[in-house]
Amino acid sequence: MKKIAMFTMGTRGDIQPYIFLARGLVKNGYDVVLGSHPCWKDLVERAGIHFEPIGPDIDIEKEAAAIRGKNQNPALSMLKTMNFVFRIIQDSTHEIYEVCKGQDLIVVSHSQMGATEAEALGIPIVNVTLQKEMIPEKLKPQTFKDKLLGGMIGKQMAKPYNKIRKVYGLTPVKSSDEILSQKLNLIPISKYVLERNPYWEDHHILTGYWYEEDTDYTPDEKLVQFLESGEKPVILALGAMSFEDTSEKDKLDMFINAFQRAGCRAIIQGFQKTLKDYELPDTMIACGSVPHSWLFGQGCFVIHHCGFGTAAASMIYGIPSIPVPHVLDQMGFAKQLCDMNVATKPIHAGDLSETAIYEAIREMQISFDEKKKNAEAISEKIRKEGGVAEAVRLIDMNLK
């Protein structure tokens, strides 16, 4: 039995695709271990996947929210978050190295966690990339300015990896691109959502989204009664973006007031801390942790931060979106959904207000039929792709 280790860091939306891939690999006879933050142990093990804790035992979603709360500029916020993750990876390299021992293949996320340790052990890697901007355009003709700027950025990005490479006696790299697999990079996005970049090399492959239907989920009676009592509700699912303690109640107030102005019923996911002491109107209900595969089918449209996970789920399950992006990659996904006419114009975090939310809801209500039709048409195509099966097939080929 071939053994595969995969490593990733981040919020639940960053972890979930790897759980789906791991389950697909296990079903096809592989022995798989997933390494990530200790806080994700229960989530991974409930999915039947062997888990290895990597790094400090922290609530990564709240830690990331704290960084965002201190840095309102999206670019600076992303840079600070990356530095935070890099420190964890550097400090955890010996843990990662031990997990890599004896494996036949290492699956490496966009953080390149495990790539250097695999190289030190002579183990091949496969990359997974969630953001298209992270994929090098090696086939694009380079101007002098491109080369100069690319060299400066590459050198800066390589610094944290070179610190790890030094631990294992590996030669420094000039760019983080040199760490990437030259055989296979899996992009778990649908070709119906993202057009393949002609400047990518052949080993960068769009597989289709990775997901599963959560057929075992049963909603509680209170939620069922709410859904049966009126029209389909708006779903508010900000995930980790609802954790900023200093502004959480004010943010929730904005949404509730806007929903009432627009005459909307709503299901609210997230805001756990504030909702403990918050009396919601009868037209709204808090749902806690509910799988998107079930939840998104119950709503008319979804308001979300447009991270990889929720952007993917909105397309898979054919539900229009109001994006509220906080950081750069979310802004990219929000623009993509808007360009496909399955989402309204995004409300950027710095512009969030009751009026902005209300106006976005009105925009959605006016154009809903068209956006819903588009979302359902794309969903129908996506659900025929079999992204996990394609990723497993490509990994099979890579190991032969």
Write out the residue ranges for each language-model feature:
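Short glycine/proline- and acidic residue-enriched helix-loop micro-motifs
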Residues: N73-F84, K147-L148
